[in-house]
Curated annotation (Swiss-Prot):
It is found in: Secreted. GO terms for cellular component: extracellular region. It comes from Plasmodium falciparum (isolate CDC / Honduras). Keywords: Malaria, Repeat, Secreted. The keyword Repeat applies. The keyword Repeat applies. Residues 169-190, 211-220, 238-259, 268-277 have a biased composition (Basic and acidic residues). This is Knob-associated histidine-rich protein. Residues 221-237 have a biased composition (Basic residues). Residues 95-114, 162-277 are annotated as: Disordered. KAHRP might mimick human histidine-rich glycoproteins to anchor host thrombospondin or a parasite analog in a binding complex with the endothelial cell receptor.
Amino acid sequence: AFSEECPYTVNDYSQENGPNIFALRKRFPLGMNDEDEEGKEALAIKDKLPGGLDEYQNQLYGICNETCTTCGPAAIDYVPADAPNGYAYGGSAHDGSHGNLRGHDNKGSEGYGYEAPYNPGFNGAPGSNGMQNYVPPHGAGYSAPYGVPHGAAHGSRYSSFSSVNKYGKHGDEKHHSSKKHEGNDGEGEKKKKSKKHKDHDGEKKKSKKHKDNEDAESVKSKKHKSHDCEKKKSKKHKDNEDAESVKSKKSVKEKGEKHNGKKPCSKKTNEEKKKKK
């Protein structure tokens, strides 16, 4: 099924030979996390599938660039189980049928092109390449470089929003964030602490500087002079306070005399007594 004129290989992730036929692999990871792939050689899609080579061969579907007439192999494609031809990949933006995913069964679908005849693909007779001729699909919903339809409802596999958030690693990180935060809080505490210590050091430096200034000041006779002034002032202030306290004592005494002498309230009590009688 692999001809010289169409040199795709199973793990060709480049776009040098036309559209990136494995563009969907990143969007719908097939059993291996992106983190696990870092630094490793890219796995062939057939090695990623739970069913191994048989499932891989059963799901192949020809996608060609413009120079090819027969091609192999294509990305594993997911298509709605019930695929009316009103929508580019089958299904309509309104009936939600594009959410039902299955491996393509090689029978062709008008959703992939106006004339998609039945062809057994890899299940063809031995000796024939059995690949289906590619018929360009109608343009509705397609965008470059690889035609993943736009306009599907949010939350479907075809939605540009949900591909990463709902099924990809970003979503997983979000859901396991409680664990993540615990670690972060610890680090935050450390940072806060170290900042605090830094501030303390700053304070120490400041106080040392302040002390030096004071030493320098004390040399000046002006400062001694002003200290004497302060002392005089404070003495005067004390005298004032003593005077104040004498005054206040006096006023308290006067108030007391008023009450202890003829009470202004005694008149009232006498009247009340009369009433009771």
